[in-house]
Amino acid sequence: MAAMAVGGAGGSRVSSGRDLNCVPEIADTLGAVAKQGFDFLCMPVFHPRFKREFIQEPAKNRPGPQTRSDLLLSGRDWNTLIVGKLSPWIRPDSEVEKIRRNSEAAMLQELNFGAYLGLPAFLLPLNQEDNTNLARVLTNHIHTGHHSSMFWMRVPLVAPEDLRDDIIENAPTTHTQEYSGEEKTWIWWHNFRTLCDYSKRIAVALEIGADLPSNHVIDRWLGEPIKAAILPTSIFLTNKKGFPVLSKMHQRLIFRLLKLEVQFIITGTNHHSEKEFCSYLQYLEYLSQNRPPPNAYELFAKGYEDYLQSPLQPLMDNLESQTYEVFEKDPIKYSQYQQAIYKCLLDRVPEEEKDTNVQVLMVLGAGRGPLVNASLRAAKQADRRIKLYAVEKNPNAVVTLENWQFEEWGSQVTVVSSDMREWVAPEKADIIVSELLGSFADNELSPECLDGAQHFLKDDGVSIPGEYTSFLAPISSSKLYNEVRACREKDRDPEAQFEMPYVVRLHNFHQLSAPQPCFTFSHPNRDPMIDNNRYCTLEFPVEVNTVLHGFAGYFETVLYQDITLSIRPETHSPGMFSWFPILFPIKQPITVREGQTICVRFWRCSNSKKVWYEWAVTAPVCSAIHNPTGRSYTIGL
């Protein structure tokens, strides 16, 4: 049968389905669709024109089977190759009570039969503003029984009536007409998934028409859980050789959908009758093969998209060998460090002193030695003499450093097994070098570590890095909201998972406004009273109707003069993959209207044993303060 099943785009192949409104012979049709290269078939579970009666006699008791037998296909084929479709006459939100009640019963009958067949997914239409009863019937179905189907809501990218020329002037306006026409369908979807309490089993099948909305509307859709994209054959153009192709704008949208690994569904009749129907699918394959290749960062991050990880706590915990190994593979970070040390050595030691002036370098938090090697390479490149101390608190990593020293470094490097804050240095350093930054700059306690070590830096000494700044940006992402919600632990407060940050490769999300600087730290810190607690207020203008789910955190650091590292999207160091962004979630999604401002308050707090963040949204509405007193998350000193 078909090569693949619903639910996965294996490798680089496009996963695709054929949408049909009527299937007289199911086994024959499935065979023909598979022969054309499609992986699954979308079809009605009941005959689309068979209106069942559930209320009135005698039609209510009409004899005979309601639909065809499940024995026409094997259980495996039902499980993997068929996506069910709701009959088009079912209208659970009809204002006519008889139609509504009949529709409710018919909808449950079809959903239950789909569950009985074990269908992997079921398509339901969202084609009007009010879908409240549809949401109730579906939610009740999800919460009863032990089935595991996904429910794909078929939502048009642009509402069909917005394309009509005959819209009646001065007609009474409905609620959603306070939104622009091209935003209507997103509002339908947002209200629907809110009514369904963000169920992970409800996703979007986005129907793409000939006309596309503006980029910000498309951007917002790409933060939604899109599982499928429905492409009508009518949107395809014809090239010189008679083959179906898409406009440049549509191609760009397809490239973005391919990144989300959506499945494509072709619907409609063959508009290119000289060509086989499979030519539509072949064109999608062609686009997939010719999309821009992934960069080094995307290749490294493959498989980690939207996967939540707890931030490392290298001060409190000793890292494992594999963790060091991953970070050491970064091609950019250490070359930037080498360049910074090289420049610093040239600035500190004039040419005429290069044979007599020996610079004392201390690598604080040496790990398995990558910064020591970068320092030695920089000294060689600059033709300057250095004396190195490699200070590391993890006794397991010290074994690696001592082996390096024995086999490679020799007496030029002194390995010190100690916490840098407690070490009594035999001399003062000209340069201290460290890589203590986390995804939010200071979240691995670089300020506390370097402040505790700066007493053994000379008065004119240099710290590499010399400065770092965290950044925040508001984001919308159903996927991440649901991932955080699923992190609930048995013995903790039921909302504790919303009061802690996560390191995550952001993928299925929409950034609502440009990142803004949050906290800045400089080294050496010459303040007479050093205090690393911080408080900032950030205001983000939002130009689109949307929903806020949390904040993405980034950082930039100045290693030395003009040598920098950054994970802020606008200035991201090309090819660097040592850090994924950080996510600060919020407990309750907040609806934001176009033109409103999101105001967030962020605190960095500490006591003698730990550091933590607190955060709260104060506009357009107030949230609770998250993580007060560090009750859900702290970073151990």
Swiss-Prot record:
Residues 465-637 are annotated as: Beta barrel. Belongs to the class I-like SAM-binding methyltransferase superfamily. Protein arginine N-methyltransferase family. The active site is at E435 (proton donor/acceptor), E444 (proton donor/acceptor). It catalyses: L-arginyl-[protein] + 2 S-adenosyl-L-methionine = N(omega),N(omega)'-dimethyl-L-arginyl-[protein] + 2 S-adenosyl-L-homocysteine + 2 H(+). Pfam families: PRMT5, PRMT5_C, PRMT5_TIM. S-adenosyl-L-methionine binds at Y324, K333, Y334, E392, D419, M420. This is Protein arginine N-methyltransferase 5. The keyword Translocase does not apply. GO terms for molecular function: E-box binding; histone arginine N-methyltransferase activity; histone H4R3 methyltransferase activity; methyl-CpG binding; protein-arginine N-methyltransferase activity; protein-arginine omega-N symmetric methyltransferase activity; transcription corepressor activity. It is found in: Cytoplasm; Nucleus; Golgi apparatus. Its main location: cytoplasm. Arginine methyltransferase that can both catalyze the formation of omega-N monomethylarginine (MMA) and symmetrical dimethylarginine (sDMA), with a preference for the formation of MMA. Specifically mediates the symmetrical dimethylation of arginine residues in the small nuclear ribonucleoproteins Sm D1 (SNRPD1) and Sm D3 (SNRPD3); such methylation being required for the assembly and biogenesis of snRNP core particles. Methylates SUPT5H and may regulate its transcriptional elongation properties. May methylate the N-terminal region of MBD2.
